[in-house]
Amino acid sequence: IRLDRSIEDKGFDKYRLTPLPPYIKHDESLAEEYQTVYADPLGSKAAPTAGLHFTSELLSRINQTHTVAELTLHVGMGTFAPVKTDDLSKHIMHEEHFSVSSDTAKLLNASSHITAVGTTTVRVLESAQKPFASFTGSTSIFITPGYQFKAVDSLITNFHLPKSTLLMLVSAFIGSVEEMHRLYRHAINEGYRF
C-alpha cells in the first residue's frame, strides 16, 4: 500500500485502533492506558509493554542517578504470535523495525552496564551489538536458550505467555528454562505483577 500522506496525518485518527495483546479484551477505553509515556513517533503496531510501568516521574527519578538512552521501536504484531513448531530452527521469527540515534549510540558505547526495558529492546541491541552506531533497520533475531548475550547486561520485562518467543528470550537471558520456571513460580506465589 502506498499512501499519499504520512501515517501521522490526523485524518487517519478515526481509523486507528490500539493493538492489544490477545489476552486483553479490546476496549477503546484502554487505548490511553495501553501506551507508554514516551510513545513517539507513530508506527509501532503494539506497545512495548515493559515500558508501561514507567511514568514520567519515575523516568525523571531514574535520570537523576542513571543515564536513560532512548531508541525508537516499532513493535510488530508478531510479538504476540506463539511458536507453532517443535523444531525451533523452523520457526519464522517476526521482524521489528527500529532506529538508534547517534546520541543514543554514544550513550550505549559509554555505558559499562546496559539494562534493556523489554524484549524488543533486547532484540534490537543484540542485533546492533557493540560498538553501537546510529542505525535504522529491522531485526528478526530469534533468541533462544544457549544464546550468548553480547550487548545487554540486565532486563526489565513482563510475564510472557507459554510457547512464545518472548518467553524463550527470557529463558535464554536467565540461563535455562528450568530456572525461568522456578522464578515464575516464585513471582506468582509472591503476587508480583511483572
Predicted regions and their residues:
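Surface-exposed, charge/polar-rich loops and edge strands
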Residues: I1-F194
